């Protein structure tokens, strides 16, 4: 058991090192995409399933409340939090539409969809991205593995942050770290002296 614990830590560290080498440009582009949207008076919609839903909620909470320092609230909505809406849509046998319907209702040109999917193949996330495209929204996608179907939907203005791993747990850990990086970059860009 002790050896297995060391393996988990070692794999996580190795994934972090690989991501630190491969992802800074994509994370920086994503942060600036989010910042520009916010500066233009737009909002960020975010979605994910399972652990990715938790990461989406963490991002939205960090925008609305705060990340590490006090600052004004920023507009972000986690689409996976309203159980009544989610179950009403799913009850009509539209499971794949649980996020897309919300994107079509709430999303506007200039808004950003933060779509989080470990493999990039979750049908409801793919449909949300397709809906965001029809609303002239920009997409920031957090993925892993080969990026899945999600990667093929992104245009030149969109940003994919693909974790260099084929292990779901490692990808999800890195998604959380990436979300924290994005929150930090947004705060330090919009409120550079807030922590002084």
UniProtKB/Swiss-Prot annotation:
GO biological process: carbohydrate derivative metabolic process; DNA replication; positive regulation of DNA-templated DNA replication initiation
Domain SIS: 34-196
Pfam family, one: SIS_2
Record's keyword terms, sorted: DNA replication
GO CC aspect terms: DnaA-DiaA complex
A molecular-function term among this protein's GO annotations: carbohydrate derivative binding
Alphabetized NCBIfam families for the sequence: PRK10886.1
Family (UniProt): Belongs to the SIS family. DiaA subfamily.
Quaternary structure note: Homotetramer; dimer of dimers.
Chain's role: Required for the timely initiation of chromosomal replication via direct interactions with the DnaA initiator protein.
Name of the protein in question: DnaA initiator-associating protein DiaA
Record organism: Salmonella typhimurium (strain LT2 / SGSC1412 / ATCC 700720)
Phylogenetic placement of the source organism: Bacteria, Pseudomonadati, Pseudomonadota, Gammaproteobacteria, Enterobacterales
